[in-house]
């Protein structure tokens, strides 16, 4: 049964992208019909166009929903289980403890972007999608994410000096990012990134 397949492949309370469902010899049209039947029966819940999930049991009448950022990750940042994008903007600065700002708009960079800049709506939330400077993969997504942050660090960061340097280097050490990893991608960024890295104390302080 299709339901058993969905449980095995996607699990409970995880995003199910209609476009990724491949079940036996069932056609796309038949899959859509079966998904609609499961949704009408309350076995599946619709999150947004083409996105469903198997809800877990809940004591609340409204039931459960999916974490927004989890949906973003599956829809835009992964392709066949591999990385094809990353979060960017204020969310990354907040993750590193560089700002107390909470992002009102989700910003991502993805190989799936069809334009350099595009705005879409997902579950009534605005998402900004940018095309990457080079193709994103499992090996470079953290590096490109870090360089995107450094390009605009002067705009995002509320901390400076040693605090800024310590938080940046801690992140680099955590994800094993060395200057030699950054160097081959610097060509794709504007010259201001060198100034930002210097002012953050990274040109001489990047872990070797």
Which residues are covered by each model-predicted region?
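Short beta-edge/loop segments at beta->alpha junctions of small alpha/beta modules
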Residues: 1-76
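Amphipathic alpha-helical interface surfaces
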Residues: 31, 88-89, 142
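Short gly/ser-rich loop at a beta-strand->alpha-helix junction or flexible surface loop bordering the NTP-binding
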Residues: 47-51, 78-116, 121
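Short, surface-exposed loop/turn motifs that are enriched in glycine and acidic residues
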Residues: 62, 78-82, 136
């Amino acid at each position: 049964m299709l339901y058993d397949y969905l449980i095995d492949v996607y699990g409970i309370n995880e995003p199910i992208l209609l476009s990724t469902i491949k079940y036996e010899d069932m056609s796309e049209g038949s899959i859509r019909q079966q998904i609609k039947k499961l949704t009408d029966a309350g076995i599946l819940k619709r999150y947004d166009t083409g996105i469903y999930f198997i809800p877990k049991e809940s004591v609340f009448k409204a039931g459960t929903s999916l974490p927004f950022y989890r949906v973003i990750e599956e829809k835009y940042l992964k392709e066949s289980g591999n990385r094809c994008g990353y979060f960017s903007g204020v969310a990354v600065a907040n993750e590193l403890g560089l700002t107390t700002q909470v992002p009102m708009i989700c910003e991502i960079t993805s190989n799936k972007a069809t334009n350099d800049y595009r705005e879409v709506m997902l579950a009534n939330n605005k998402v900004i999608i940018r095309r990457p400077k080079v193709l994103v993969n499992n090996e470079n997504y953290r590096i490109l994410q870090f360089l995107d942050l450094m390009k605009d660090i002067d705009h995002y960061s509320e901390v400076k000096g040693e605090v800024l340097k310590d938080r940046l280097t801690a992140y680099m050490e955590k994800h094993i990012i060395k200057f030699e990893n950054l160097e081959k991608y610097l060509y794709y960024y504007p010259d201001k990134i060198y100034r930002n890295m210097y002012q953050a104390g990274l040109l001489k302080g990047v872990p070797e």
